[in-house]
């Protein structure tokens, strides 16, 4: 039983690392910047989704009234689906949380 738990833990962490390695270089660079900054509360994370058949990367806001960001695979900012004073973002990308699928946490600050 102990070995099964160990194998499960190792495989979970290696899957996250493998997903991160397939992320575009610009997203990996953003993660490098996050790692060089003090740990946030809540911890910073990057979540990959498929949105309208394309890979996108959602970065949640770190604090109240700030926008969350969604980037495409070239780090073009697509919009802010949530956050801001209303919590509703800027309305872009349109229907993000309804249409986005296959979420994968590719990085979370676990310091």
Where are these regions (language model features)?
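Bacterial signal peptide processing site
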Residues: 16-18
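Positively charged n-region of N-terminal signal peptides that target proteins for export
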Residues: 1-4
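N-terminal domain-onset segments
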Residues: 23-42, 100-106, 110
